[in-house]
Amino acid sequence: MSAKIILVFCAQALFVQSALSQCTSRATVAADRGIIGGYGLGAPYGLAYGLEAPLGLGYGLGAPCGLAGPAIDITPTIGGGLPVSSASAIAPVGLVVASENVYEGILAAAGELPFVGTVGVEGVLPTAGAGAVHHSCGDGINAMASRDAAFAPGYAGAHGIGLGAYGLGVPALEVPALGYRAGWRGCGCGL
């Protein structure tokens, strides 16, 4: 009877450890996430992503997107790679969004879809549109970036002359520190 109790107790301890374990970040605190690390007060090109970003004011004061750092670095969403399978001769290295739908007639699609490199369409299909690829690196995390309009009203639209969606000056005339949203990456996430 005592052997069964010990076995059940050990099994419960194993299940609790499995259920409550999580990977909170790819980097250690001493390596790159401290106050003087890559997102803090000292990094290449000066004070990257902190009080002064590589080309402007950065995401916030001391950490990206404010004072506490990005949620992706402290949530359990960072872990191992997402398993992707393919019948291709080249091994898959990322996430693939595929659609097997048939569209007939006129189709208008708008919005954002994160894609890293390629888009494939089979068959005869007259299309019009645009796509952009943005790769970020520095601490090993490859991220997609999306730029939304700033909260301050612009004088002449998206590329306005005032405090518009994309900066303090006409983009052709401005210096890099006066770029997107009052300092390359924004004065605290788009303010």
Curated annotation (Swiss-Prot):
Instruction: Name the domain of life this protein comes from.
Output: Eukaryota
Query: Which Pfam families does the entry mention?
Result: Chorion_1 (PF01723)
List the GO molecular function terms.
Answer: structural constituent of egg chorion
Any signal peptide, and if so, which residues?
1-21
Q: Which UniProt keywords apply?
A: Repeat, Signal
Q: Which GO terms describe its biological process?
A: chorion-containing eggshell formation
Question: In the UniProt record, which is one GO cellular component term?
Answer: egg chorion
Function of the molecule: This protein is one of many from the eggshell of the gypsy moth.
Q: Which family does the UniProt entry place this protein in?
A: Belongs to the chorion protein family.
The protein in question is named Chorion class B protein Ld10
Q: Which organism is it from?
A: Lymantria dispar
What taxonomic ancestry is recorded?
Answer: Eukaryota, Metazoa, Ecdysozoa, Arthropoda, Hexapoda
